[in-house]
Amino acid sequence: MSAIVGLCLLSEKVVLSRSLTDEVSKLYKLNRGNVKEPRKYATERMSTQSKPVALQVPVSTIVLDYKDEDFIKQNPTYSAMDIIGSPSNTAPQTAFQSIMPSLSALFNTPFIQGAFRHRIISSMGPEISYLVMVIGPPSGFMDTPNVSSAQSSVHTVSNADVDLNDIIAINSTMAKSTKLVSASTLQAMLVNDVYDRCMDLDGILLSQALPFFRNYVNVQSKGSLPPAVAACLNTPIKELFSMGSGKREPLTLEFRKDNEGQCLGIVLPKGHEGDTLSSRYPAVFINESEPFSDKERSELSELKRTDSDAYEKLYSETISKHVSDGSYGNRVIISHKMSRLSNGGVKIIGRFKISDFNTVKKNLSSRSGEVDSAKEQWEALSGNGLVTDSNISMLHDKILDTITSNKPGVVLRDGNKKSENIVVCFKNGFPNKKHSLLQLTKNGISVVSLDELTDAGILVESTGPDRVRRSPKALANKLSSFKGRKVTLDVDNMSTEALIQKLSAL
């Protein structure tokens, strides 16, 4: 399924005054498995009044707009921004476009926007998903008003020009600038709170989006927008599909098989312990020269001594040859130079280096003859999109985050551990306030919804009276017919490490 989804990270509890559309209900069912049927009526207590509402959504996400695959196929020249909307658009056409400029004007601060795109090549063909999330306001909030009326409610911390203690003024501003004034309850947050709040969101959706978005929030909070993100947002949907190894041709939406997908690679100079990554995660990473034959290595070694330009040309051609014959498989290629990957037909998904070259020199203390070439490679990496860190372990973590963002479903497990993926479903919902879904994913544990659970997976039921949740009839039937393994765990009183250890031992 291809989908573009507009998400707002605004409150722990969202009360909508309208029913979910069929498309949005379908989206929640696919990813959560616990969509509540719209109630005919309900009330939300605010101050001394009760406000009528139509539905309570049991997650901290507002789905303001959702476009499915059919819509995308019918409008292949639309970009994500065309579909979801620009925050500067004063004449909005969709719910998402409508509410964001209004909130930005109301709070007198920019709302941080991020877009995450992941592309999956499957037996069913290319699939593309967008998560467009909004976090704001990002900083400088002091007052904590609680404003309510029959038309709107806002609980936020802000330094807005509007006097947030003046209920009449705030309601007047909301009514004038916000077309969806009664659509949601809003709660602002600081950038430092992004990570914790993200973990409270839809776990299945965010397990891939979080690493990218976390970095994007940090960059955007410093006042710069990565060109790649801007380009991604404004590229026609049909041009986001490319075919074949080494080709970048725009396509319309059509099907193809797994083994026809483009190889992915990262650039990591010498002295950055690339061998550690490939040995620890052999199913995920492969060094650029690993498939080379003895004859190829000998030819390259001879050229390296006599003609450096010819050496680099042959190196790229050798990589291209092994890309074409499938020697790299579905693994991410680690290369010391960008040119080797790009000339070899490999898609570069990240460039990484240690911020201080002295650290690289220490790592090469036993290989002093390689320091000069390592420095040349290190200095060649610069510009937008370069990821750096002063610590090698932290840099490797950032690499892993990039891999999970670009290769959804990848299992990051140590090489000495069993390679099969562990699929689990938490009957009462993933305990995201207590545990990190990202850590489970990195340890080879995939958390799925009840709809996606097969008899080969594990059903986890959480203890405690507060973990009881009523299931819709369809999901109740799924539970009764489940023949796989079941386990009861006190997940609320376990550390994430203990939970991972327990699930891995099952």
From Swiss-Prot:
Concerning Pfam families, the annotation shows: Phytoreo_S7 (PF07236)
Q: Which domain of life is it from?
A: Viruses
Q: Is Chaperone included in the keywords of this UniProt record? A: no
- Keywords tagged on the record: Capsid protein, Host cytoplasm, RNA-binding, Virion
First and last residue of the signal peptide: none
Give the UniProt subcellular location, in the record's own words: Virion; Host cytoplasm
InterPro entries referenced in this protein's UniProt entry, alphabetically: Phytoreo_S7 (IPR009873)
Q: State the residue spans of region: RNA-binding.
A: 128-249, 325-355
Q: What is its main location?
A: virion
What GO annotations for molecular function exist for this entry?
Answer: RNA binding
Any single GO CC term annotated in Swiss-Prot or TrEMBL for this entry: host cell cytoplasm
Q: What is the protein's known function?
A: Probable component of the transcriptional machinery present in the inner capsid. Displays dsRNA binding activity and may play an important role in the sorting of viral RNA and virion assembly. Together with the RNA-directed RNA polymerase P1 and capping enzyme P5, forms an transcriptional complex positioned near the channels situated at each of the five-fold vertices of the core.
Q: Which family does it belong to?
A: Belongs to the phytoreovirus protein P7 family.
Q: What is this protein called?
A: Protein P7
